[in-house]
């Protein structure tokens, strides 16, 4: 029975169930939303499903939401701000109960203004949107320290965007400053088309080929492309050149078991994001029914502490 609130006899329930089966009835979720009821649906916005991190994150989020009785609308923005905005508008028009976003586009004002539960993963969307993330700064330090311990004299950082917001870069710079080594930071923008990315990575590396002997790449696919470039130069990994990545997804560990990387707790990030979002949804429902516990609602708007990462040693360092 679609709505089981109130008393129904077993005989009535069976008759309704038979009628539903015969008519192939499907609840109209938007109509339910217009009547103030939950649509039991969540929007998930990711910048790409091509990177294993976001593919694995999506899988876990969808799985955890299904366990709680929610459907997931997966929106792949392809790293484009206009497409992300379109998906955001679409999700709002479909009256989803909440949104989980791992967007890579800064400045979308709607995240700060929509009256809907929102949680971000590894991105600061707004001071009012809780952010679930790993300890990126610690990960940057661990990666740089590992390269130096393995004998690297001048490790470079290869990342998607540089600046104070890049905490992996911050950790890398801290370690090199302590070792009195000048940082070498190379960038290939996150939104670079896949077909162009390998060529740009090679261009960046060739500019510093004579000056560096190791690379910390802030994602594992980039690290794999660095390994290919090193081998094309006739150098040996790790004897002549060392490489470490970041993410440690199941797919990469299966495809490239030799790659040294910093592993994020992706399943834990996904579960935390789901739990935090559903807590917000429950809190808003309680508020609308007269519960004025503002302290409890504020708790669900605070970002949790960053989750720890770990070094997965391989044969590339």
Identify the residue ranges that each predicted region occupies.
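Conserved functional loop/turn residues at catalytic and ligand-binding sites
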Residues: 1, 24, 38, 69, ...
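Alpha-helical structural signal in soluble globular domains
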Residues: 19, 60-64, 110, 167-179, ...
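Hinge/beta->alpha junction and helix N-cap segments in small-molecule ligand-binding domains
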Residues: 29, 47-56, 74-83, 132-142, ...
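Alpha-helical recognition/docking segments in bacterial nutrient-uptake
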Residues: 37, 41-145, 149, 204-210
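A short helix->loop->beta-strand "cap" motif at the edges of active sites that frequently abuts
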Residues: 114-118, 181, 238-241
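Flexible loop/turn connectors
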Residues: 203-317
């Amino acid at each position: 029975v679609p709505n089981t609130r109130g008393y129904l006899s077993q005989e009535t329930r069976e008759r309704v169930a038979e009628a539903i089966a015969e008519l192939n009835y499907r609840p109209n979720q938007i109509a339910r939303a217009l009547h103030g009821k939950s649509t039991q649906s969540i929007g998930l916005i990711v910048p790409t499903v091509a990177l294993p991190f976001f593919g694995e994150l999506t899988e876990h989020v969808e799985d955890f939401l299904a366990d709680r009785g929610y459907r997931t609308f997966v929106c792949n923005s392809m790293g484009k701000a206009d497409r992300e905005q379109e998906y955001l508008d679409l999700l709002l028009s479909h009256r989803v109960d909440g949104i989980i976003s791992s967007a890579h586009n800064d400045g979308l004002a709607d995240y700060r203004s929509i009256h809907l539960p929102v949680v971000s993963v590894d991105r600061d969307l707004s001071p009012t949107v809780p952010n679930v993330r790993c300890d990126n700064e610690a990960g940057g330090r661990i990666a740089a320290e590992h390269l130096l311990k393995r004998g690297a004299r001048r490790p470079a950082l290869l990342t998607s965007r540089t600046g104070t917001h890049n905490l992996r870069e911050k950790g890398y710079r801290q370690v090199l400053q302590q070792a009195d080594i000048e940082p070498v930071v190379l960038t290939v923008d996150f939104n670079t088309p896949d077909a162009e990315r390998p060529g740009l990575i090679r261009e960046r590396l060739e500019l510093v080929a004579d000056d560096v002997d190791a690379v910390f790449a802030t994602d594992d696919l980039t690290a794999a492309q660095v390994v290919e470039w090193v081998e094309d130069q006739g150098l040996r990994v790790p004897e002549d050149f060392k490489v470490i990545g970041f993410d440690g997804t199941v797919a990469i560990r299966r495809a490239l078991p030799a790659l040294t990387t910093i592993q994020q707790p992706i399943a834990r990030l996904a579960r935390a994001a789901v739990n935090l979002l559903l807590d917000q949804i429950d809190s808003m429902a309680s508020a609308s029914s007269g519960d004025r516990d503002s302290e409890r609602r504020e708790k669900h708007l605070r970002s949790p502490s960053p989750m720890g990462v770990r070094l997965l040693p391989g044969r590339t360092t």
